[in-house]
C-alpha cells in the first residue's frame, strides 16, 4: 500500500492507460487451486498475501447446481419462504449452512414478494441495466474465505471474496458488502448482488460480529464455515469463543445454566471501532484474491500483482451497520483503496458539539446528531408506551393482545418516574410519542413504533451495544441481562441442538431472535425470565423490565466503572466526516424509525461539508415513504401499504457512483425523493409496486425538493 493517496480522477486516468497491459496479463493467468497459503514472494511485483490473512479456502461454483448469489436456489428459491433445511438438522454440512445462510440473509434485507418489486425492479433476474430477464439469476464463480486476525485467534474476523466468472480484467471492479446489523459474513449478500451482476468482485466481512453463539452449556463454538466444535477442539480456529470475566465460564455456567454468548456483545473487543479497518482489510484481501486468479505469472512461476488498487474501481457499499462501516472505511482510507461510496441507511455516530443545525422546512429539528446508543436507549424507555398512542390505531401491530398490558404497564411506570405525563394510558402514551418527537424522531416514523416495540428492537440494540462498548464479559450480565433460549415457562432452557447447529445461517447476532431471547436475570418474582414479560424490582410490575432499560440509559452519563468503560468505547466509534474527496451517495428513508435521519445522514451531510467544504462530492438522497426494514414490507401487515423499498435506491446509488467513476457522469444533487406509497388499508394486500411509485433521482431537483448544506447547517425541505 502506498503512503500517499492517489485522487480518484488520477486513478481513473491511470486505469485507462493500463487497460491494455491488464488485458494482456489476464491471458497469462493460471488455473485456481482449492486452497492457498502462498505468499508468492519471489517475483518483481509479487502478489503477497496480506499478513493479517490466515489460511485461505477457495471454492468454485458452476452457476447451475450452486452459485455465488443464490447458492443454487435461483430467483424463485430465494423468494420461497421454505428454507433449504439441512438433511441432518443437528449436523449440517458447511455447504448446507452456506445455502441456508444466503437464503436467510437475502430475505432479511429485501422484500422478496413479486408485488413488492422483486423480480421486476430488483432481484437476481433483473440485469445490471435494469432489464427483466428469464434468467434464474445464478452467478458462477469462486469464493475465497479466510480469517483476518492479529495472531491471537481472538479476533478472527471473517473475510470472503466472491469473484464472478464474468469478472472483466479489462474493466476490473469491486464493491464492498460489509454485513449489516451484527450478521455473519453473508449478511449483505443482497448488496453484493449489484456487483456480481456487473462482473465485479465483492469483498465481504462480518466485521467482527456474527450470528452463531458460544453455547456455554456444551462449550461449543462456531468455526469459520458455521459448523461447530468444542472450544478445546476449535482452539484458534473458533470464529468466536467467549472470554471469561471476573468469573470463569465454568463457574458462571454452573450458577447460570443455558446462557449463550454472542460475538458483537461479548467478544470484549468493541468491534465497531474497527469496522472501517475490517472493511479496508476486506478490500486488500479481495485485491490479493483477484490477482491470485488473474495476475500474470513471472518466469519463475510467481504470481504477480498485475491488477493493483490503482487499476480496480472500488466502491464501498452496504446498508445499516455495513453502510456505516463503508463510510468509516472511506474516512480511514489513507492508502487510496476506495474510489467511491454508495450506502443505504447508514449507522453513523456523530461527534458531539459539531455546531451543525439540521432544519426541516423553516424550522430547526428538535434534536439531531445523537449517537446510536443515546437515541436507542431513549427509545428503549419510551417506545413501548408510545406504541399505545391512539393516534397510531391504524399502525402495523397496534392491536397485539400479547403485549398490550405490558405496554400499558410501561406507561404507568414512566408516569410514576416522571418521564411522561398523564392520568391514564391514552394520555401517557401520547406524552411518550411526543417525547420521541422531541428526541429527534420525525412524525413519519410514528406508524413504525408499535411493530418495533413488539419486536423489542430497541432493547436488543441497547443491550448489545452496552456490552460491546463497555467490553463486558458474558459473565458480567451488564444491567442484569443475559441471552438464553426459553420454553413455555419463559425461563432459560437448553437451546435445541438443531437450532444451535444452524444459527450461523438463521441468526442475526442480536437477540431476541427466536429461539434465543433476552433474559431479565433480576426479576424478583420469577428469577431469570423472558425480558418482555418480566417484572421490575422497583415497581413489582410487568413493565418490560423498566429497571433494566433505565440502567442501560444511565450508563451513558454515569460515573461508575461500567459507565466509564461504555463512554470510552462509544468515543472510539465516532465519525469524522472526511470522505477524502471520494464521490459518495447516501440514501436514507425519511421514515426510518431505527436509525432516524435527524441523528445520522442529515447531520453527517453537514459534518462532511465542515470537513471538505465546497469540494465535497457527497450527495444525500432522502427517500419519502422508506424505512429501515425492507424485508418487513412483505411480512408485516400494513407495511406494504405505506412503504417503498429503499433497496431500489441503494442500487441506483451504486449505479450513480459507478457511472461517475467510469464515465464521468455527474452525481445526483442532494434531494428529497418524492415516492408514492402503494396504498390500500392495513389488512388488505397492497397493489403491486410500479416504477411510478419509485421515481429515479432527479438530475436537477425542483427547489421544493433540493437539500442544501453549508458548514453550519443542513436544510431539508418538508
Curated annotation (Swiss-Prot):
InterPro entries linked to this entry: OHBut_olig_hydro_put
Main location: cytoplasm
Keywords assigned by UniProt, alphabetized: Cytoplasm, Hydrolase
GO terms (BP aspect): butyrate metabolic process
Pathway where this protein functions: Lipid metabolism; butanoate metabolism
GO MF annotations in UniProt: hydroxybutyrate-dimer hydrolase activity
Catalytic activity: (3R)-hydroxybutanoate dimer + H2O = 2 (R)-3-hydroxybutanoate + H(+)
One Pfam family from the record: 3HBOH
Compartment(s): Cytoplasm
Active-site residues, record numbering mapped to chain: 320 (charge relay system)
Signal peptide range: none
Entry GO CC: cytoplasm; extracellular space
Induction: Induced by PHB accumulation.
Role: Participates in the degradation of poly-3-hydroxybutyrate (PHB). It works downstream of poly(3-hydroxybutyrate) depolymerase, hydrolyzing D(-)-3-hydroxybutyrate oligomers of various length (3HB-oligomers) into 3HB-monomers. Seems to have also poly(3-hydroxybutyrate) depolymerase activity since it is able to release 3HB-monomers from artificial amorphous PHB.
Classification via HAMAP family: 3HBOH
Family note: Belongs to the D-(-)-3-hydroxybutyrate oligomer hydrolase family.
Stated name of the protein: D-(-)-3-hydroxybutyrate oligomer hydrolase
Native organism taxonomy: Bacteria, Pseudomonadati, Pseudomonadota, Betaproteobacteria, Burkholderiales
Gene of this entry: phaZ2
